[in-house]
Structure formats: structure tokens, C-alpha cells
């Protein structure tokens, strides 16, 4: 067993034991603190500043030691606003890293980076806590068996299936549907698998965090009547927080997920929205700490910081953490160092396309750009693999023909190519799907489609059995039977109009 959760927080009891320092300098969220000789705190130790500001308001700021400067000074990054702090204020070294509550007490609750509840539902049981900094599991503890994680979303399960205990990246620019896709996955997984999820909101909009919380209460993922029956713990460090909080909130969420995996021996889902904001916060902190920037202005420690987070997300003999991470792609440039570094850690990538979103095809998952290491015949089986490859070939041929169609029109294509285009357009529309969490916007009830149903549907389109049906019948439906029923309805409607 790897985790040794402590049974109380890093509180210091008597005055004699306290290691006290004083603030020597404040630059935004970065504090320099002077300690007595021989009493220097360790790197990553939590420091607490308590006192009153100039107007008598209570101040309680937690910081994390980042650098030992020499001359008995340390440089620390604040986890909350430094408003009201002054030079000379007393600082307490807790002699331990930040520790957060873990276990069943966290379910159904919203926490900040320090593990404090922020949902006005009273205190949380903090008898079991874990430090947020920990090494990754040893090789001998890792579990290497391969199995598919069914999501109920057609395009994902068929073309870029997720690995149980793997890491999945959701790539896309602003406004193409990353957060909606994450909400749908949380919903489907809670209902279909009954698993526990931990959601880490890293540097995203407060409104989205609130919407997600309300959505979860409505869908029953969070049980208001009996909080302990809830299926998710939420940890937020949103856009308005200082960079220190945004940089560490991912580790807080991961620590809670690790406890469910290692101690409760459960399969856990860890959602991080957005991993780019973790890198962005690290970049801000790096500049404030005086490090020389690297490529495109990012921190020189980018790969190390990313690795220390990602390597802890894995399957062990006790349980698994399957992680789904939204990755904002700055200016839709996949070669930017932040998304490029993230790619190296992923088992599957789900790339969202602005072109598909513009066509109104949701989820706007690009079927040709999205990849998965799981799409191999020995893992998914021959039937699934063959169907996925034929779907990709058809869509790729359609993509190649689009320039010819734009210049010369469909009539100039050969009979075979025209058939390919017709089927590709049906496939493109059949890859769309109504979501449970988007019912409010679309008015269509959400659909969960099993993998076997998904494969059957695409096989029927590819075989030519459904060539007579109109394209519109395949748009925003669940399984293939719904598409044929929709085609009949469309036919009836068109007859009535005549």
C-alpha cells in the first residue's frame, strides 16, 4: 500500500514548537520570508500568514515554499490573494506540505486548493488527510492489462476508444465543446458504470463550475438528500484565483482520486478542465520566481511539472485512475509547447474540430485527427477494427474529393466516388449524437449507445443497405434504428407538405 494518510492536518500545537518567520518582501502572489538561522523550512512546506490588515480584517493566507534563497530567506507562492499583507508580518512554518481531506467525506462537496469546502454545506471530516506532493507509484505496483472503457458516445467508442486506467486528452480551441463533452462523460460514467469521479476545475470559468455543480445535482450525480451517496468530488481553482492556486489545484484533485484508488481500491475517473491552465499558471509562477523563460515564453520546467502530475495518474494492482483532460489549444496550434508536452503522456486523443462545430455536428470530434493506442485488432477485436478503418477510409476519401467537388461539382465524379461521398456524408452525420447534458439547449433527449450497437450501425451504412435514406435522418440520433425511424417520419412529413 503506497498511501499513508495522516489522521490530522499539519497543525502545530505549542508555541515552543512553532517555527516563525517574517515577511521580508511581497511581489504580487510571491512572498520572501526571513527565518531564524538553522530554522529554514523545506521546499513545498506550507507556510501560514495570520493577522489583521490595516482596516482590521482577518487575514489567513497559506503559501508554499518554492525556493531557498540564502541569507535565511525563502521564496513562497501564495494560494490566495495577498491583499492586506505587509512586510514584517509573522509567518508560521507548518513543517509539512499542504494536506487535503480524502475519502468518502469528499463526495458531493466542492473544495478549494487547500481542501477547504466552499459550498456552504458545513465542515468536512478532516480526520483523514493526505499531502498533495507524493511520488508516482513504483513500477512493481503498476497494472498493465489492457481493457476498453465504454463511454456510450459513438464517435469515441468506435474511432478513438478510451483505455481503462489510461490518460485521454480532449483537444480543441475556445468554444468547440470540450466542457460539454466532459460533463456528458461524467454523466454517462456515473449512470452506466456507477464509478466515483473527481473533477478538477483548473483555471476555468467560475460560471461553468457553478453550472456543472447544478447540472450534477439535477442529474443525481450529486445526491442532495444524502450527500454520502454522491458519485463525484469537485475541486475548483478558477480563473480569478492567484497562479499558485491554479498550479496546485490539479494536485489536490489527484490526491483525492489516489485515495479512492489505493485505499478504497476503486476505479476512479479524474477529470481535469483544463490542463493548459495548469501549464499557464506554472508559467506565471516561473516568471515571478525569476526563472529564464523557455520556448514561446513557457517555463523551463514545463516537462518536469507535467510529468510529476501525469505519472501519478495510472493503474495499480489496487485500482485505476482513468483521466480525461481538456486541453485548450492556443490559436488552434497543436505544435504549441503546452499541448505538445501533454500529447507525450496520452493513450488517446479526442480532437475537436471547429469545422465540424460550424456544420452543427456535435460532438465536434474530428474522426480523422483523433487517435487511440487501443485501436488494435488484438485489443478491440477484428470486427471493431475493420469497421473503424473502413469508416476512416471513407471519410478520408471524401476529404480528398472536396476540392474537386468545390471546383467542378458532384456531377464530374465517377459513380463510385459519388457513392463514397453519399456514404461519407451519412457517416459524418451519424457520428453526431444528442447529449443528456445538452437536452436543455437542443430539446432532444440524450442517448447512450453501446459499442455493439455503434459497430452495427456503421456496418449497415458501409454495406450500402441504407443508401436510400436521406442524410438528414442520420443527424443527431442514437442507434441506427432511430435513423431509419427518423427517415420514415421525414418521408411522411414531406408527403403531408405536398
UniProtKB/Swiss-Prot annotation:
GO terms for molecular function: ATP binding; ATP hydrolysis activity; proton-transporting ATP synthase activity, rotational mechanism. Coiled coil: none annotated. It is found in: Plastid, Chloroplast thylakoid membrane. It is a peripheral membrane protein. ATP binds at residues 172-179. GO terms for biological process: proton motive force-driven mitochondrial ATP synthesis. Its main location: plastid. InterPro entries: AAA+_ATPase (IPR003593), ATP-synt_VA_C (IPR055190), ATP_synth_F1_bsu (IPR005722), ATPase_a/bsu_AS (IPR020003), ATPase_alpha/beta_chains (IPR050053), ATPase_F1/V1/A1_a/bsu_N (IPR004100), ATPase_F1/V1/A1_a/bsu_N_sf (IPR036121), ATPase_F1/V1/A1_a/bsu_nucl-bd (IPR000194). Its EC number is 7.1.2.2. Keywords: ATP synthesis, ATP-binding, CF(1), Chloroplast, Hydrogen ion transport, Ion transport, Membrane, Nucleotide-binding, Plastid, Thylakoid, Translocase, Transport. PROSITE patterns: ATPASE_ALPHA_BETA. F-type ATPases have 2 components, CF(1) - the catalytic core - and CF(0) - the membrane proton channel. CF(1) has five subunits: alpha(3), beta(3), gamma(1), delta(1), epsilon(1). CF(0) has four main subunits: a(1), b(1), b'(1) and c(9-12). This is ATP synthase subunit beta, chloroplastic.
Amino acid at each position: 500500500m503506497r498511501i499513508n494518510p495522516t489522521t490530522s492536518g499539519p497543525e502545530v500545537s505549542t508555541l515552543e514548537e512553532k517555527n516563525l518567520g517574517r515577511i521580508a518582501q511581497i511581489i504580487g502572489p510571491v512572498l520572501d520570508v526571513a527565518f531564524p538561522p538553522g530554522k529554514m523550512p523545506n521546499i513545498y512546506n506550507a507556510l501560514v500568514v495570520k493577522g489583521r490588515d490595516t482596516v482590521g480584517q482577518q487575514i489567513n493566507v497559506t503559501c508554499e515554499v518554492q525556493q531557498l534563497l540564502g541569507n535565511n530567506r525563502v521564496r513562497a507562492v501564495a494560494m490566495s490573494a495577498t491583499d492586506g499583507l505587509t512586510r514584517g508580518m509573522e509567518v508560521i512554518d507548518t513543517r509539512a506540505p499542504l494536506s487535503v481531506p480524502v475519502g468518502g467525506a469528499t463526495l458531493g462537496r466542492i473544495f478549494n486548493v487547500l481542501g477547504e469546502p466552499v459550498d456552504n454545506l458545513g465542515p468536512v471530516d478532516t480526520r483523514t488527510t493526505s499531502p498533495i506532493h507524493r511520488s508516482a507509484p513504483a513500477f512493481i505496483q503498476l497494472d498493465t492489462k489492457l481493457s476498453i472503457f465504454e463511454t456510450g458516445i459513438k464517435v469515441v467508442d468506435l474511432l478513438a476508444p478510451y483505455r481503462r486506467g489510461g490518460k485521454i486528452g480532449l483537444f480543441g480551441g475556445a468554444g468547440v465543446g470540450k466542457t460539454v463533452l466532459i460533463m456528458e462523460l461524467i454523466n454517462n460514467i456515473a449512470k452506466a458504470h456507477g464509478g466515483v469521479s473527481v473533477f478538477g476545475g483548473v483555471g476555468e470559468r467560475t460560471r461553468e463550475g457553478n453550472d456543472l455543480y447544478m447540472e450534477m445535482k439535477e442529474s443525481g450525480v450529486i445526491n442532495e438528500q444524502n450527500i454520502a451517496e454522491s458519485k463525484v468530488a469537485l475541486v475548483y481553482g478558477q480563473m480569478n484565483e492567484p497562479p499558485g492556486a491554479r498550479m496546485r489545484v490539479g494536485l489536490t484533485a489527484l490526491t483525492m482520486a489516489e485515495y479512492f484508488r489505493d485505499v478504497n481500491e476503486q476505479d476512479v475517473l479524474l477529470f481535469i478542465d483544463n490542463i493548459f491552465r495548469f501549464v499557464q499558471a506554472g508559467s506565471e509562477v516561473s516568471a515571478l520566481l525569476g526563472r529564464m523563460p523557455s520556448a514561446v515564453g513557457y517555463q523551463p520546467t514545463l516537462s518536469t511539472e507535467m510529468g510529476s502530475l501525469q505519472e501519478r495518474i495510472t493503474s495499480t494492482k489496487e485500482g485505476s485512475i482513468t483521466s480525461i483532460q481538456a486541453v485548450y489549444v492556443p490559436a488552434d496550434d497543436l505544435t504549441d509547447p503546452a499541448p505538445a508536452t501533454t500529447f507525450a503522456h496520452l493513450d488517446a486523443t479526442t480532437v475537436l474540430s471547429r469545422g465540424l462545430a460550424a456544420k452543427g455536428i456535435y460532438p465536434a470530434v474530428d474522426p480523422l485527427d483523433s487517435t487511440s493506442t487501443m485501436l488494435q485488432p488484438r485489443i478491440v477485436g477484428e470486427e471493431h477494427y475493420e469497421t473503424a478503418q473502413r469508416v476512416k477510409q471513407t471519410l478520408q476519401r471524401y476529404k480528398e474529393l472536396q476540392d474537386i467537388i468545390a471546383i467542378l461539382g458532384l456531377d464530374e465524379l465517377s459513380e463510385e466516388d459519388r457513392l463514397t461521398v453519399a456514404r461519407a456524408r451519412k457517416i459524418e452525420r451519424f457520428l453526431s449524437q444528442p447529449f443528456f447534458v445538452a437536452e436543455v439547449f437542443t430539446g432532444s433527449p440524450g442517448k447512450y449507445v453501446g459499442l455493439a450497437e455503434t459497430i452495427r450501425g456503421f456496418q449497415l451504412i458501409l454495406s450500402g443497405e441504407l443508401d436510400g435514406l436521406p442524410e438528414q435522418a442520420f443527424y443527431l440520433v442514437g442507434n441506427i434504428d432511430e435513423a431509419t425511424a427518423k427517415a420514415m417520419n421525414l418521408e411522411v412529413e414531406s408527403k403531408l407538405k405536398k
